[in-house]
UniProtKB/Swiss-Prot annotation:
Gene3D superfamilies with a match to the protein in the record: Alpha trans-inducing (Alpha-TIF)
Annotated domain remarks: The transcriptional activation region seems to target many proteins of the RNA polymerase II transcription machinery.
Record flagged with keyword Transcription: yes
Name of the protein: Tegument protein VP16
Record lineage: Viruses, Duplodnaviria, Heunggongvirae, Peploviricota, Herviviricetes
């Protein structure tokens, strides 16, 4: 498995691929931001030394450079154009932040922490790994539920291991932010003293922290944790996708009944081929809804979720969703996930004899410091009554259709692809005039262990070969473009 993963991601660094999935996608689909350096699952990524105190804008750009995440702001903006709750399925890991005093909503706590804190200067590996091994596909489809649980457990282990490093990075940047604000306040205090205005330095610092520290910290945390969740999801899902596409027999007739609609929209989907029915509490997922979710996944460079029962023959795999201005946005749901971390310290700690208020930010007093709020915090989703406080990755209910109940394979009238199976085909050293259909018929399937022969009187239908499904070319074309194979003559 390690070799397969290494092969997938070895050449991704330093390559600027074209927009994702050019074959079969809508012509008016906007291009996603370019891929940043993905690297290998086993390859460490060490952060540079802690930043120096600089203005918040420069500090934000430094974070993007350190992460290699120049597409971060564009992706944050893209989240404002969607309504789907993409993040509620992720564990919040709020317990990891209960002792992070630099996240306290009391400026006096931040001052005490900032004056005493020493930035972490030892190497910080933001690709740290957990103790759980990457699960391999089972031998039989009856083991798919266990495989799903193993994938979810692996994701949780990797997420928690990496989040410890990201938490340290956030502390280093918050320390640099605090020291810059403190230096600015000291300069203003000296100027006020020279003009004969005696002002309390600590009170000035508290006011500045209340005005700027929390806003800038939330801005840093937003791009930092987007990098964490998106980067880790890409690594794991593309590795799993490469394995799952090689074993279509495991997913024939697979039916998945999800617990909630937010589970369907979650970015991390351990099973990407559901060739039976796809339902949410027994309600079939509409084809357009699946296309809209796949549009989002495509623009975030994540594998698409395929379902033969939900897809319509001849229809594109993705459709741009229509933004509903009166509904919650993906960026707001993401901020709720981040706020669960940022508010963790203040939700359990007390300082200076005060009990931290636990209500939503909208109901807090105007003088109460917080990390911002969004309209999403006031909305009730259709499945809120049954959603646990810590949603996590809930396994779907799985079953399998019998052979006679399985949906027919989807096909399109003509594949839109740059791949030609008959280009420069040479056999036995001689140039042969052969069509793509002939090339497929000529291929010896016995080399792959496929010794089944057609029934008596049955022959291959050349029309079916002439109308190959777009999806047959999608994976090869996608990896050819993403890894720049054509550019290197591969």
């Amino acid at each position: 498995m390690d070799l397969l993963v290494d092969d997938l991601f070895a050449d991704a660094d330093g390559v600027s691929p074209p927009p994702p999935r050019p074959a079969g996608g809508p012509k008016n689909t906007p291009a996603a931001p370019p891929l940043y350096a993905t690297g290998r699952l086993s390859q460490a990524q060490l952060m540079p030394s802690p930043p120096m105190p600089v203005p918040p804008a420069a500090l934000f750009n430094r974070l993007l450079d350190d992460l290699g995440f120049s597409a971060g702001p564009a992706l944050c903006t893209m989240l404002d154009t969607w309504n789907e709750d993409l993040f509620s399925g992720f564990p919040t890991n709020a317990d990891m932040y209960r002792e992070c005093k630099f996240l306290s909503t009391l400026p006096s706590d931040v001052i005490d922490w900032g004056d005493a804190h020493v930035p972490e200067r030892s190497p910080i590996d933001i690709r740290a790994h957990g103790d759980v091994a990457f699960p391999t596909l089972p031998a039989t489809r009856d083991e798919l539920p266990s495989y799903y649980e193993a994938m979810a457990q692996f994701f949780r282990g990797e997420l928690r291991a990496r989040e410890e490093s990201y938490r340290t990075v956030l502390a280093n940047f918050c320390s640099a932010l605090y020291r810059y604000l403190r230096a600015s306040v000291r300069q203003l205090h000296r100027q006020a003293h020279m003009r004969g205005r005696n002002r309390d330095l600590r009170e000035m610092l508290r006011t500045t922290i209340a005005d700027r520290y929390y806003r800038e910290t939330a801005r840093l945390a937003r791009v930092l944790f987007l990098h964490l969740y998106l980067f880790l999801s890409r690594e794991i899902l593309w590795a799993a996708y490469a394995e799952q596409m090689m074993r279509p027999d495991l997913f024939d007739g697979l039916c998945c009944d999800l617990e909630s609609w937010r589970q369907l929209a979650c970015l991390f989907q351990p099973l990407m081929f559901i060739n039976g029915s796809l339902t949410v509490r027994g309600v079939p997922v509409e084809a357009r809804r699946l296309r809209e979710l796949n549009h989002i996944r495509e623009h975030l460079n994540l594998p698409l979720v395929r379902s033969a029962a939900a897809e319509e023959p001849g229809a594109p795999l993705t459709t741009p969703p229509v933004l509903q201005g009166n509904q919650a946005r993906s960026s707001g749901y993401f901020m709720l996930l981040i706020r669960a971390k940022l508010d963790s310290y203040s939700s359990v700690a007390t300082s200076e004899g005060e009990s931290v208020m636990r209500e939503h930010a909208y109901s807090r007093g105007r003088t109460r410091n917080n990390y911002g709020s969004t309209i999403e915090g006031l909305l009730d989703l259709p499945d809120d009554d049954d959603a646990p406080a810590e949603a996590g990755l809930v396994a779907p209910r799985m079953s399998f259709l019998s052979a006679g109940q399985r949906p027919r394979r989807l096909s399109t009238t003509a594949p839109i692809t740059d791949v030609s199976l008959g280009d420069e085909l040479r056999l036995d050293g001689e140039e042969v005039d052969m069509t793509p259909a002939d090339a497929l018929d000529d291929f010896d399937l016995e080399m792959l262990g496929d010794v089944e022969s057609p029934s008596p009187g049955m022959t291959h239908d050349p029309v079916s070969y002439g109308a190959l499904d777009v999806d047959d070319f999608e994976f090869e074309q996608m990896f050819t473009d993403a890894m720049g194979i054509d550019d290197f003559g591969g």
